[in-house]
Amino acid sequence: VRDAYIAQNYNCVYTCFKNDYCNDICTKNGAXXGYC
């Protein structure tokens, strides 16, 4: 399961094109990691 998809409430719910951006915004929103 990739973090870019809503699969679990702690996963990244943002579609990301760059892993660093995804990780940054996801961790700010409480995810453990936001990498796709």
From Swiss-Prot:
UniProt-listed InterPro entries: LCN-type_CS_alpha_beta_dom (IPR044062), Scorpion_toxin-like_sf (IPR036574), Scorpion_toxinL/defensin (IPR002061)
Cleaved signal peptide residues: none
Top-level lineage group: Eukaryota
Stretches assigned to the LCN-type CS-alpha/beta domain: 2-36
CDD domains: neurotoxins_LC_scorpion
GO cellular component terms listed in the entry, alphabetical order: extracellular region
Record bears the keyword Isomerase: no
Transmembrane portions of the chain: none
Tissues and organs where the protein is expressed, per its UniProt entry: Expressed by the venom gland.
Subcellular location(s) per record: Secreted
Stored Pfam families: Toxin_3
Coiled-coil region list: none
Gene Ontology molecular-function annotations: sodium channel inhibitor activity; toxin activity
Entry keywords, A to Z: Disulfide bond, Ion channel impairing toxin, Neurotoxin, Secreted, Toxin, Voltage-gated sodium channel impairing toxin
Disulfide bonds: 16-36
Its job: Binds to sodium channels (Nav) and inhibits the inactivation of the activated channels, thereby blocking neuronal transmission.
Similarity annotation: Belongs to the long (4 C-C) scorpion toxin superfamily. Sodium channel inhibitor family. Alpha subfamily.
Name of the molecule in the record: Neurotoxin 8
Organism: Buthus occitanus tunetanus
